[in-house]
From Swiss-Prot:
Similarity annotation: Belongs to the MnmG family.
Residues that bind NAD(+): 273-287
UniProt-listed SMART domains: GIDA_assoc_3
Protein name: tRNA uridine 5-carboxymethylaminomethyl modification enzyme MnmG
GO cellular component: cytosol
Organism: Shewanella loihica (strain ATCC BAA-1088 / PV-4)
Assigned keywords, A-Z: Cytoplasm, FAD, Flavoprotein, NAD, tRNA processing
Biological role: NAD-binding protein involved in the addition of a carboxymethylaminomethyl (cmnm) group at the wobble position (U34) of certain tRNAs, forming tRNA-cmnm(5)s(2)U34.
Amino acid sequence: MHFHERFDVIVVGGGHAGTEAALASARMGSKTLLLTHNIDTLGQMSCNPAIGGIGKGHLVKEIDALGGAMAVATDHAGIQFRTLNSSKGPAVRATRAQADRALYRAKIQQILQNQPNLRLFQQAVDDLIVGNDRVIGVVTQMGLAFEAPAIVLTAGTFLSGKIHIGLENYSGGRAGDPPSISLADRLRELPIRVGRLKTGTPPRIDANTINFDLMTEQKGDDPLPVMSFIGDVKDHPKQISCFITHTNERTHDIIRGGLDRSPMYSGVIEGIGPRYCPSIEDKINRFADKSSHQIFIEPEGLNTNEIYPNGISTSLPFDVQLNLVRSIQGMENAEIIRPGYAIEYDYFDPRDLKNSLETKAISGLFFAGQINGTTGYEEAGAQGLLAGMNASLQVQGKEAWCPRRDEAYLGVLVDDLSTLGTKEPYRMFTSRAEYRLLLREDNADLRLTEKGRELGLVDDDRWAKFNAKREAIELELQRLRSQWIHPNSPLVDALNPHLNTPITREATFEELLRRPELDYPKLMSVEGFGPAIEDQRAAEQVQIQVKYSGYIQRQQDEIDKAIRHEKTGLPQDLDYQEVPGLSNEVIAKLNDHKPDTVGQASRISGITPAAISILLVHLKKRGLLRKSA
C-alpha cells in the first residue's frame, strides 16, 4: 500500500538528529516527512537533562547559527545556565544548560508543528525501498510505503537495541520504547560495515527522599547566559540549583562486590561504551586509586520529583544499584524511581559516508546521529542539520556542502568520522579542533550564518538581527582604529589611573584596548572614550577580535597553507598498490579508508608526511592531480 503523496525528503526518527534534519530540509523548501514511532516523544531527552558543555556547546551555537532549533528550545527550557571555563580564554569557554525535559520536548514539538513544508506521521519504519543502488522510499510497520528520492536515517539507539540491567536483558530502543529489529536487519544487508556500541544511564532518584542539606549547592551564573544568538534572558523559565555529592570507599566496595553480576564485566555486553562518559563500574575499575568520584545531582524539571545523578551511570543489578545509591552522602534514604541500565545497539562505520553524510553505497540515503557512532544530543543535532540540508540540496539538484575543519566544529566532527571512523562512541571536545581559536562559541554566527542564509536555512528575522550585530561590530572596530589619543591630550589624565604604565606616545583606541590591564567596558567607562555599543554580544566580539588579532592572523595563515592540500582530490578508484614507495601499512590504511582528498589522507593515523609527498608525486606524474569540488 502506497501513501497518497510523494515527498522530497523523508526523515526517519524524531530524536535530536531527526528533528534538526527535518527542520533543515523543510526550511530550505523541500517537502519533508518526519516518521517517528511515537509523536509524543519527539524531542525527547533520552539520557541526561542538559544541553551544551565543552565542545558540545560550540556545536549547539553552530546549529543555532544555521537556523536550527536546539539553542532556541534550550533557552525556553533551561532551568540552570552556566559558562564553563569562564576564567580561561574565549576559545574554550562553553555554555551549558540544565534543561526541564518536559519544557524542552514541548518547545521542539511546537517548532516542528509550526514549520512550513513539514509533515509528521506516526509509524515505525521496517524497510528501505532501494533500486539500482538508489533509495526510493521506506516501508512502515503496517506495510505503508512512502516514496522520496532522499531518506535521512536517524535511528539513535533503536537498531537492534538491547537493554541490560544486571544479567537480565531484553530488546528495547530505550526504556519504555520498542527496538527497530526489522530495519536493523535490512540495513545489515547493505554493503556498509556494521558494529555494536553501548551507552548507559543512571538510576533516577525521588527528590523527596534526598537530604540536600548534606550536599554542596551549585547555583547558576549571574548574569544568566543565553544559548541562542537570537535568544533573550526573558525566554528562560524559573532558575534552580543543582547539588554536588561524592561516592566513597563503601560505595566502591558495593560496586566491586556486584561486578560478577555486571553485564559489562561478565562478557554479556559486546559493545564498547563511551570513553568520556564511563559507567560507575568503569570508573571504579579504571581509577582504582581514587577514593571518591563527584556526582552532580541534577533536577529533571520544575514540575517533577525525578533527579538525575550525573556520574553513576550503571547496568548493575537493581539491588546493587539501590545499595550503592544509599551509600552516598545525602542519599542514605533515597528511593529509585527508574533503574539505571546499559543499552547496546548497531552503528554503521562512518567511513562509508561522504562528508555530506550520504552513504557511499546507496545514493540518496543519509545517516545522522548515533547510527554514525557518535554520542550526545549536540553531536546528533549537528549531524542531523547537515544531513537534512544535504538531502534537500540533492533533491534540488545542487551541490552538497559541509564546512571545513577550520570553519566549524561540525566540520571537525564530520571529517573525523568520515576519515578516521570510530570504535567507541565519539564525543566532541575543543581539543579535537586544531583551529579552535577561530572556532569559538561567540563567533559561530559570524562564521556560519551568512552561509546558512545562502543555503536557505536562515529566516528573515534571524538574518536581520545578525546583520545588525555584524554592522555594530564593524562600525565600532572602525571607530577604535580611527580615533587617537596623544600624551598631551586632556583624556590622558582620566585614562592613566587605569593603566599599569602611563601613555608616552600617541596610540589608537584599538591599541589601548590591546593592553592586558584594559577591557572594553573599562575603556568605555573612561570619559571621552565612549559611548560603548549597547549589544553586549557585539561588544564581547569587539574585545576578542582586538585582543586576539595577532593570534587569529597567525592561525589564519596556517589554515591558508593547509587548505592547499585539503582541496587536492584523490580518485575513488585509485589503486594504492600501484603507488611506488608506499609501505604495505600505508597502502592498507588508504585502501581501507578511501579518503576523498589528500587532506583527509594526511589525518589518517599512521599516514606520514613522507607518504603524502610520495602520493602527491605519483598523482602529478599520472596527471591525476585535481581539486575537489
